[in-house]
Curated annotation (Swiss-Prot):
One CC-aspect GO term: cytoplasm
Record's subcellular location: Cytoplasm
Record's keyword terms, sorted: Cytoplasm
Entry-linked Pfam families: DUF2129
Keyword Amino-acid biosynthesis annotated: no
Main localization, broad class: cytoplasm
InterPro entries per record: DUF2129
Name of protein: UPF0298 protein RBAM_014860
Record family assignment: Belongs to the UPF0298 family.
Superkingdom: Bacteria
């Protein structure tokens, strides 16, 4: 059985504390230049986890990832340029 997962983006003042975020979920990515951590945890625990993480002094901002709520199936539409055949009259 797979649990639904959702990402949390945590902006930090310093990357020194990025290892401490492992206890909240799986650390997927750490950006050294922009000082943020992408963390994955269970979708039903996301609100509690965000409140807990934002209470720490080394955390600047916490944002949820909206990827699970996006529609990823796209409709294939033809280009307008390819739709018309301009060489018919020649």
């Amino acid at each position: 059985m797979e649990n639904k997962r959702q990402g949390i983006i945590v902006y930090l003042h310093s990357l020194k504390h990025s290892k401490m975020l492992r206890k909240f979920g799986n650390v997927h990515y750490v950006s050294k230049r922009l000082k943020y951590v992408v963390l994955y945890c269970d979708m039903d625990l996301i609100e509690k986890t965000m409140e807990k993480i934002s209470s720490y002094s080394y955390v600047k901002k916490v944002e949820p990832s909206y990827k699970p709520f996006l529609k990823l199936e796209f409709e294939s539409k033809l280009d307008k340029a390819k739709e018309y055949d301009y060489k018919v009259g020649i």
